[in-house]
């Protein structure tokens, strides 16, 4: 799993182009969960996350704990409790299945919320128009190979 985390004063997105089929997107949105096509977040950790095939071998619980702990650590270093998960499958050639990726993202979001963090996800299966304001200090950008 590769993770590029930014502390962002402001992170806004809007869906631009759907890049997966409706059936593939449905894996991320079970039941009637609605896709939020546009949102703005402030004072948050924005995590660009790439789940790799090897992560499936390590298991969901292991990967969930590792990623959640990493994100909480970065959040504490930046004095925020708001964390935004963004699927970014451009950090490695290896890719996990969509099903595993969806399960992991939902599990991490739930774990963060259970730990009193404000957690959410950008829309999965879309290219997004992004607008990001990130300050220029060391802990505002953290790379992780988890």
Where in the sequence are the language-model features?
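Non-catalytic terminal extensions that flank enzyme cores
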Residues: 1-20, 44, 132-146
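Conserved mixed alpha/beta catalytic, RNA-binding, or beta-rich assembly cores of soluble enzyme
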Residues: 9-77
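Active-site-proximal loop/turn and secondary-structure-junction residues that shape catalytic pockets
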Residues: 10-12, 53, 89-91, 123-128
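Alpha-helix N-cap and loop-to-helix initiation/capping positions
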Residues: 59-63, 96-103
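Flexible, glycine/charged-enriched surface loops at secondary-structure junctions
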Residues: 77-82, 118-120
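Short glycine-rich, basic-tinged beta-strand/loop micro-motifs
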Residues: 79-95
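Phosphate/ribose-phosphate-bearing ligand recognition and processing surfaces
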Residues: 93-98, 111
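Divalent-metal-activated hydrolytic enzyme cores
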Residues: 102-146
């Amino acid at each position: 799993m590769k993770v590029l985390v930014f502390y962002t004063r402001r992170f806004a997105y809007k869906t631009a182009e759907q890049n997966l089929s409706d059936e593939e997107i449905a894996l991320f949105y079970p039941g009637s969960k609605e896709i939020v096509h546009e949102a703005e977040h402030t004072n948050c950790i924005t995590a660009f996350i790439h789940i790799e095939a090897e992560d499936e071998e390590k298991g969901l619980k292991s990967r969930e704990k590792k990623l959640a702990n990493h994100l909480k650590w970065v959040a504490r270093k930046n004095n925020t409790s708001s964390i935004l998960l963004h699927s970014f499958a451009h950090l490695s050639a290896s890719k996990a299945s969509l099903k595993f990726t969806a399960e992991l993202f939902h599990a991490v979001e739930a774990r963060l919320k259970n730990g009193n963090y404000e957690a959410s996800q950008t829309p999965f299966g879309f290219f997004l128009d992004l607008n990001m304001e990130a300050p220029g200090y060391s802990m505002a950008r953290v790379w992780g190979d988890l």
